[in-house]
């Protein structure tokens, strides 16, 4: 490299070196430049590194007396102006060199990994709604503005950057995870808590690569009715699919499509219900009604009652021969009695019809006397002021699910009118019982109370209709 540079180029490099390393000789500059093949930047770094280690204490690197005298004169002139605290031997003092900084570029995987485990996480992308559920609620990030940012001592540049990032933060707040509903802990801890509180475990497995996950945060979990239902009846646990807990859930329940919403029995770990993709709030509320009628313990007790009482007795193939013979004799006697009474029944059928009231007629007479006269059902309100309207979902005894708009000032008697209008003609003579499914425990509605939908708390809720 030295042979390729002319003497003029070498002299310019030496002059540049002396401008940076103030107080050094041309010989010192030439030595460092020759050691680094006349690369100025590397020579400067080598000079400062050697200065820290005391490598420049040899006699060849000392400054000549002429330079010392000139520096002393300049310092003496400065002290003559009134700065008497500066000593002459401070002339040789050189400020500490800047530390050498080496930077390395990493891929995106390292960037996102640092966000999970590091104490200081970089500002995430607005479209990445969440990364670490256990850490994000504790530290102010993209979801919430820092308290220090609003102080009066903020500089003009800081306020400008905040105003530039405001649209991005407002967009991210739309997809904010439901931290007020989420259980903070592992999957096993969530099951333990659900079992101790006798509540179903509602699991939401999310993915940042699927926009449906962010739609669930924006539309479903942010819905007031859904939020109240989950708080009252479920333990909600949300997890990301690339975390350890998320992969565990995917493997255990063999999940192939993300996002997924699961209802899990915390006692047995059994998957009771599953939804994939985006789930509308109204459809989710309708599907959750059966789980609001009772907790996991009641469900387990009902299963134990359905078991046959003779489950631990002998099997039919191992019955004693005496019992089998008795059963055959009883069957023969029943056949003989049926054959002998058949003729008598045919003869007396006409007399029975004229003297005995059929049971069905009696039941119809009783039910028709019990059922009140329902008010006429007005036309469903459409358009107009939405603040005066409400939406009620009803689950009929046959499993059919309906929704209808009412005015908030309508009385609850119209709910019975609507239910009976959707039933078959043969079912309209049976009395119905309406119970409010959300929020909290079920509440039976009284037909005699002349309350409005808003006063009774039925507006924008789910109603379950069953036979009395």
Swiss-Prot record:
Gene3D superfamilies: DNA helicase RuvA subunit, C-terminal domain, Glutaredoxin, Phosphatidylinositol 3-kinase Catalytic Subunit, Chain A, domain 1. Interacts with CDC48A via its UBX domain and with ubiquitin via its N-terminal UBA-like domain. GO terms for molecular function: protein-macromolecule adaptor activity. The lineage of its organism: Eukaryota, Viridiplantae, Streptophyta, Embryophyta, Tracheophyta. This is Plant UBX domain-containing protein 7. PROSITE patterns: UBX, UIM. InterPro entries: Thioredoxin-like_sf (IPR036249), UAS (IPR006577), UBA-like_sf (IPR009060), Ubiquitin-like_domsf (IPR029071), UBX_7/2 (IPR017346), UBX_dom (IPR001012), UBX_domain-protein (IPR050730), UIM_dom (IPR003903). Residues 138-168, 299-329 are annotated as: Disordered. The modification N-acetylmethionine is found at residue 1. Residues 328-347 form the UIM domain. Expressed broadly in sporophyte and gametophyte cells. The gene is PUX7. The keyword Protease does not apply. The UIM (ubiquitin-interacting motif) is required to engage the NEDD8 modification on cullins. Disruption phenotype: No visible phenotype. Keywords: Acetylation, Nucleus, Ubl conjugation pathway. It comes from Arabidopsis thaliana (Mouse-ear cress). Residues 385-466 form the UBX domain. Residues 150-166 have a biased composition (Low complexity). Its main location: nucleus. It is found in: Nucleus.
């Amino acid at each position: 490299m030295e042979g390729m540079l002319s003497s003029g180029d070498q002299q310019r490099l030496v002059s540049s070196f002396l401008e940076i390393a103030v107080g050094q000789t041309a010989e010192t500059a030439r030595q460092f430049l020759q050691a680094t093949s006349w690369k100025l930047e590397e020579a400067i770094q080598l000079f400062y590194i050697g200065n820290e280690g005391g490598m420049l204490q040899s006699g060849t690197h000392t400054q000549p007396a002429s330079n010392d005298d000139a520096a002393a004169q300049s310092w003496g002139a400065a002290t003559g102006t009134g700065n008497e605290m500066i000593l002459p031997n401070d002339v040789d003092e050189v400020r500490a060199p800047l530390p050498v900084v080496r930077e390395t570029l990493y891929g995106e995987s390292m960037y996102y990994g640092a966000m999970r485990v590091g104490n200081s996480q970089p500002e995430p992308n607005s479209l990445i709604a969440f990364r670490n559920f256990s850490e994000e609620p504790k530290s102010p990030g993209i979801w919430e503005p820092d308290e220090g940012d609003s102080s009066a001592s903020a500089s003009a540049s800081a306020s400008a950057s905040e105003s530039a990032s405001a649209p991005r933060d407002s967009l991210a707040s739309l997809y904010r995870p439901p931290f007020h509903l989420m259980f903070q802990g592992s999957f096993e801890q969530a099951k333990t808590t659900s079992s101790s509180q006798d509540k179903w475990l509602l699991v939401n497995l999310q993915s940042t690569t699927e926009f449906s996950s962010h739609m669930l945060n924006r539309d479903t979990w942010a819905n007031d009715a859904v939020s109240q239902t989950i708080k009252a009846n479920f333990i909600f646990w949300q997890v990301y699919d690339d975390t350890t807990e998320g992969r565990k859930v995917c493997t255990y329940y063999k999940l192939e499509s993300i996002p997924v919403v699961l209802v899990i029995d915390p006692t047995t770990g059994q998957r009771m219900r599953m939804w994939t993709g985006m789930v509308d709030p109204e459809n989710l509320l309708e599907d959750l009604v059966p789980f609001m009628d009772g907790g996991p313990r009641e469900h387990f007790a009902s299963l134990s009652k359905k078991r046959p009482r003779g489950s631990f007795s002998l099997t039919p193939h191992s019955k004693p021969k005496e019992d089998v013979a008795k059963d055959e004799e009883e069957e023969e006697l029943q056949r003989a009695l049926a054959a002998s009474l058949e003729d008598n029944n045919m003869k007396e059928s006409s007399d029975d019809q004229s003297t005995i009231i059929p049971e069905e007629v009696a039941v119809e007479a009783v039910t028709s006397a019990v059922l009140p006269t329902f008010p006429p059902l007005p036309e469903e309100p459409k358009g107009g002021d939405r603040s005066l309207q409400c939406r009620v979902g009803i689950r009929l005894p046959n499993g059919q699910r309906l929704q209808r708009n009412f005015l908030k000032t309508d009385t609850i008697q119209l709910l019975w009118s609507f239910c009976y209008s959707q039933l078959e003609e043969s079912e309209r003579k049976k009395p119905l019982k309406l119970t409010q499914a959300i929020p909290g425990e079920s509440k039976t509605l009284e037909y005699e109370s002349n309350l409005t939908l808003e006063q009774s708390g039925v507006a924008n809720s789910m109603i379950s209709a069953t036979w009395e």
